[in-house]
């Protein structure tokens, strides 16, 4: 029987068999995959082992258009409906072909009829636009399930143990009792007048410039701020149990970081100011020109980024404890003990973050990155900009004294005094001289008058002090005595 021109010859699937190689031989396409290939794909768990396609008997791969079929019959049925090919199909044997995995490609009409007979639904075959919409819906459902799974995992994360709660309460109380103005800092702060700190006019020995009026204002709050950091540390049992030498090293290492953190968490985006020591609100240029230099940029940027975290007092307290108990400080004696203490605070910190259930994704690792940022940006940003050693703040010596990273280095003060007056004297002839004072003289006088020099008792003289200095042998007991008792007062 002749086939009509409009009909497709039996056994010539236009999708599966139309491709030919240059020599005229047929090439196998994806729809005509071998038995080995069809059996190696993903098989859903709801199928029984070796379950067969209801159309051709090949290995089934899942429910397709309401029937359990193989990939080949699924694709054949979809193409037939999408391209409306079934009216063109015909059979040479009066629609009596037996369809199995060997003969399925020999007669499209009988294969399609069997698809319909076993229950494959034509209305479930989607056109391109509907298929795209379905894919989008599937992705949305997957994303929703991922979020639900994330919420469940967050709810299942461990919260603080009773021992950790004790550690948390002690750190929180230590912070609150040493944090000036507490939660009322916005109501009690005073803005530094705009005309102060806007024009650095006094040149320092290293070439930097500073606004003396702003510097003078900052020196009024630096010693109480240092004292509060020392008091905070002394209220932590793990710190108090350390040798005096390690306490000094840890305080010298973290003083700048903790004061910077306390200022950063009091960043006000509306006025673009930081509140220092809980009482003085300053702008970026005022802080920079008052002695901090480029480090002020690091503190302001830290304040901006931390504002999105909405940290409470406990999180700030634990962050301070982690900064304090850092084994990165050189010269420590009890490194293992300090490391275990920091790990205890870190674990309690992580569990407390789980307890608060923040809405920020990956809150804990992001917060840990901020902890490292407090250290690295404050310690090294200035050094990179100024070309100074990484261990310093990267600002002029007076700026280091102002923020207390090394808490008034004895040699730095003596060097300035030697340039201007009697060596080693705290009240040399320069300070009593009645002639007009140079900028350096005025700066040194401010240092003495402000009481910053008394902060030496908090963290001791620098290790580089001259060995033959008359006072060097007497200062270490003074430091240990201060740490064991009250912090140094202004």
UniProtKB/Swiss-Prot annotation:
One Pfam match: zf-C4
Task: Give its localization.
Answer: Nucleus
Which PROSITE patterns does the record match to this protein?
Answer: NR_LBD (PS51843), NUCLEAR_REC_DBD_1 (PS00031), NUCLEAR_REC_DBD_2 (PS51030)
Q: Which sites bind Zn(2+) 2?
A: 91, 97, 107, 110
Segments for region (Disordered): 1-32, 457-490
Q: Which residues form the NR LBD domain?
A: 163-407
Which InterPro entries did the record assign?
NHR-like_dom_sf, Nucl_hrmn_rcpt_lig-bd, Nuclear_hormone_rcpt_NR1, Nuclear_hrmn_rcpt, ThyrH_rcpt, Znf_hrmn_rcpt, Znf_NHR/GATA
Q: Name one GO biological process term.
A: transcription by RNA polymerase II
Identify the residues that bind 3,3',5-triiodo-L-thyronine.
228, 277
Q: Where is this region: Modulating?
A: 1-52
Give the domain of life: Eukaryota
What are the UniProt keywords, alphabetically?
Answer: Congenital hypothyroidism, Cytoplasm, Disease variant, DNA-binding, Metal-binding, Nucleus, Receptor, Transcription, Transcription regulation, Zinc, Zinc-finger
Positions of Zn(2+) 1 binding: 53, 56, 70, 73
CDD domains the UniProt entry points to: NR_DBD_TR, NR_LBD_TR
Result, substituting residue 359 to Y:
In CHNG6; atypical phenotype; weak reduction in transcriptional activation
Q: Which parts of this protein are zinc fingers (NR C4-type)?
A: 53-73, 91-115
GO molecular function of the protein, one example? Answer: TBP-class protein binding
Look up the record and report any one GO term of the cellular component aspect: RNA polymerase II transcription regulator complex
Q: Whereabouts does the entry annotate DNA binding, in residue ranges?
A: 53-127
What domain comment accompanies this record?
Composed of three domains: a modulating N-terminal domain, a DNA-binding domain and a C-terminal ligand-binding domain.
What is the annotated quaternary arrangement, including any partners? Answer: Binds DNA as a dimer; homodimer and heterodimer with RXRB. Interacts with NCOA3 and NCOA6 coactivators, leading to a strong increase of transcription of target genes. Probably interacts with SFPQ. Interacts with C1D. Interacts with AKAP13. Interacts with TP53INP2. Interacts with PER2. Isoform alpha-2 and isoform alpha-1 interact with TACC1, but the interaction with alpha-1 is weaker. The interaction with isoform alpha-1, but not alpha-2, is decreased in the presence of thyroid hormone T3.
Q: Which disease is it linked to?
A: Hypothyroidism, congenital, non-goitrous, 6: A disease characterized by growth retardation, developmental retardation, skeletal dysplasia, borderline low thyroxine levels and high triiodothyronine levels. There is differential sensitivity to thyroid hormone action, with retention of hormone responsiveness in the hypothalamic pituitary axis and liver but skeletal, gastrointestinal, and myocardial resistance.
Please state which protein family the record places this protein in.
Belongs to the nuclear hormone receptor family. NR1 subfamily.
Q: By what name is this protein known?
A: Thyroid hormone receptor alpha
Source species: Homo sapiens (Human)
Q: Which gene is the coding source of this polypeptide chain?
A: THRA
